[in-house]
């Protein structure tokens, strides 16, 4: 019998989840919930239906896992605990500093209802977090490094779009090659924010806008650009559509450490991602963890979980014997 999946929110992430379900025969999409008028939302799966979010509670016996595809700033802190009262839930909450409090609120709701809520699933947090944990457990004497990119940062692109005189924009985060090489060589450098990444902006300005002012507003923006070397390019709307319409991303998690009685041997563990579509990859991770949530809940587990709490075998459609035979 298929694991029945619901999607809450049908933007880039929700559409990505729908595509990922197509590639997982043991999963079945039964419902998409939206804040928009349901009749205006066209989905790709003919056997599923679109409902208003207000109807979610009526579906709680028809859905095994609800994948919540909202934003981390305002949606997920409310939605994940709320829907954990009705369903097993998965989210991609990625505000790193606020993960502990988000975990606690989801944990309380999920324990009370007997459901599981796996939070902060994706690639960072998510796959990168797992690789940090494995590397730290193995090389206890060492240093962690995370590099992001080259890729489009949605949050930074939005921040540029909010500047007066900006019609549209894309921002790329780019690792500094010399810093990456130093880490890979086991040099264990101490790197500042500015030494690890640069930022590159492609901006379509409103007609008659002050370009020098826009560039200054970008480069001096606190929390986003002021700590980085930033390059700003002004381009036409056509160029932006033609050359910058994708949502690629990726990055590297590296731990460099020493072993031996006198720390005489160096080791470098590296995990990297190169993604054509950030939301579609994130969605694929969410779907694997939906399978895990269903299985863990069937075993009687409840409460909030993170990727650290999920044994790898729960993620795969294959059973233990198959995994031991083919992947071990």
Residue ranges with predicted function:
Residues 10-11:
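Glycine-rich Rossmann-fold phosphate-binding loop(s) that bind the pyrophosphate
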Residues 267-328:
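NAD(P)-dependent Rossmann-like dehydrogenase/reductase catalytic/cofactor-binding core
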């Amino acid at each position: 019998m298929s694991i029945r999946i619901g999607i809450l929110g049908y933007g880039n992430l929700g559409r990505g989840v729908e595509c990922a379900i197509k590639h997982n025969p043991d999963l079945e999409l039964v419902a998409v919930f939206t804040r928009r008028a349901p009749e205006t939302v066209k989905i790709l799966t003919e056997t599923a239906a679109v409902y208003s979010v207000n109807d979610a509670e009526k579906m709680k016996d028809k859905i095994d896992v609800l994948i919540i595809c909202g934003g981390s700033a305002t949606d997920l802190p409310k939605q994940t605990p709320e829907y954990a009262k009705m369903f097993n839930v998965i989210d991609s909450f990625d505000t790193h500093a606020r993960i502990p409090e988000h975990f606690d609120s989801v944990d309380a709701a999920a324990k009370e209802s007997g459901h599981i809520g796996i939070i902060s699933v994706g690639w960072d947090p998510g796959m990168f977090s797992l690789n940090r944990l494995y590397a730290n457990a193995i090389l206890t004497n060492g240093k962690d490094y995370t590099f992001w990119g080259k890729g489009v940062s949605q949050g930074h692109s939005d921040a540029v779009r909010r500047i007066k005189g900006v019609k549209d924009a894309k921002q790329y985060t780019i690792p500094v090659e010399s810093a990456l090489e130093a880490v890979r060589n086991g040099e264990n450098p101490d790197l500042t924010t500015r030494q690890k990444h640069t930022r590159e902006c492609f901006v379509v300005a409103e007609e008659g806008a002050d370009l020098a002012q826009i560039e200054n507003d970008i480069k001096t923006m606190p929390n986003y650009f002021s700590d980085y070397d930033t390059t700003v390019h002004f381009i036409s709307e056509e160029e932006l559509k033609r050359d910058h319409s994708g949502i690629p991303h990726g990055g590297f998690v590296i731990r460099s450490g020493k072993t031996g009685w006198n720390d005489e041997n160096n080791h470098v563990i590296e995990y990297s991602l190169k993604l054509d579509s950030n939301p579609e990859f994130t969605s694929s991770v969410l779907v694997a963890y939906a399978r895990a949530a269903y299985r863990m809940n069937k075993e009687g587990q409840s409460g909030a979980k993170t990727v650290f709490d999920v044994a790898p075998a729960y993620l795969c459609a294959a059973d233990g014997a198959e995994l031991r035979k083919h992947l071990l």
